[in-house]
Amino acid sequence: MALNVALMYPNVKWDQWISRTAWDIHPYNLGLLAAMIEGKHDVRIIDANFDNLSPEEFSRNLEENPPDVLGISVITNEYSQSGIIAAEVAKKINPKIKTVAGGVSAISYPKPFIESSDVDFIVRGEGEYAFRDLCNFLSGDGAFPEKGVLSKGEGKVIGSGKVDFIEDLDKLPLPAYHLVDYK
């Protein structure tokens, strides 16, 4: 079964302590993740940071096209709270949406994501293959990823082991830039 997957950068201004966008970053990693799953799952990219979406606008986006999986990329520790807010918004729309946190913050400081009841999975390390395998598992096609994914359930965190570095970058597809809305 194909999943409806939304990949997103949260708006850093959702964190009460941050008053402005520090930078607009090209969604390279979201494009790469999208390319890894695009042939098997329906995927879109939401750049709430670049588009300066409010939580309410983000919520409407999810209501109009509800995902089965929301992948949240948090690119620096200072913005962890924005990622958690994105997961909260998604779970308010539909508690069955599977939320997945990834990015630098999930690798270097996963504690806020582990403590949030709105984050279901955490991808740690180079997550291209781990995220693809997690989506396939959630769609009923494959086993839980052997490496790189933390899962929360029954009051404890279950890890699937440390992900290996991707040694041959030429094996990765080109990012799915056609999914990025350049205004």
Identify the meaning behind each predicted range.
Residues 2-5:
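Extreme N-terminal starter segment of soluble prokaryotic enzymes
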Residues 8-9, 73:
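Short beta-strand segments
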Residues 10, 26-27, 67, 110, ...:
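Proline-centered helix-kink/hinge sites
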Residues 11-14, 19, 146, 151-183:
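N-terminal [4Fe-4S]-dependent radical SAM core
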Residues 16-30:
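Glycine- and acidic-residue-enriched helix-capping/strand-helix junction motifs
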Residues 29, 36-166:
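Glycine-rich beta-alpha loop elements in corrinoid/cobalamin-binding modules
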